[in-house]
Curated annotation (Swiss-Prot):
PROSITE patterns in the cross-refs: RIBOSOMAL_L20
Assigned protein family: Belongs to the bacterial ribosomal protein bL20 family.
Organism: Laribacter hongkongensis (strain HLHK9)
Keywords assigned: Ribonucleoprotein, Ribosomal protein, RNA-binding, rRNA-binding
GO molecular function (one): rRNA binding
Gene Ontology cellular component annotations, sorted alphabetically: ribonucleoprotein complex; ribosome
Known role: Binds directly to 23S ribosomal RNA and is necessary for the in vitro assembly process of the 50S ribosomal subunit. It is not involved in the protein synthesizing functions of that subunit.
Name this polypeptide is given: Large ribosomal subunit protein bL20
GO terms (BP aspect): ribosomal large subunit assembly; translation
């Protein structure tokens, strides 16, 4: 059997990793051994943070809804409970948008929530 030389495949693999490490600082951008570790770690961070992004946006929406609801004299939990009792099914993303950009509409929702809590 002929001898297999791996120069071409090794070069391609090194180029691929170094291309992924483009823009990194120091030896991480041009030393294969260091760049490989940096790219692996970047991938781990990306995987983790794609999941965290969903949690962080939900937290942001809840904070915005809470602030707007408190301006209208109702806490977040009571507001959400009131909406549920009034059978108004609007998700937190839309509620947060209304709280920021459509304050009058949000105030109407708060009034409906208050009415359903009182009933």
């Amino acid at each position: 059997m002929p001898r297999v030389k791996r120069g071409v495949t090794a070069r391609a693999r090194h180029k691929k990793v170094l291309a992924l490490a483009k823009g990194y600082r120091g030896r991480r951008k041009n030393v294969y051994r260091v760049a490989k570790q940096a790219v692996m770690k970047a991938g781990q961070y990306a995987y983790r943070d794609r999941r965290q992004r969903k949690r962080q946006f939900r937290q942001l929406w809840i904070a915005r809804i809470n602030a707007a609801a408190r301006e209208c004299g109702l806490s977040y939990s009571k507001f959400m409970n009131g909406l549920k009792k009034a059978s108004i099914e609007i998700d937190r993303k839309v509620l947060a948008d209304l709280a920021v950009f459509e304050k009058a509409v949000f105030a109407q929702l708060v009034e409906k929530a208050k009415a359903s809590l009182a009933a």
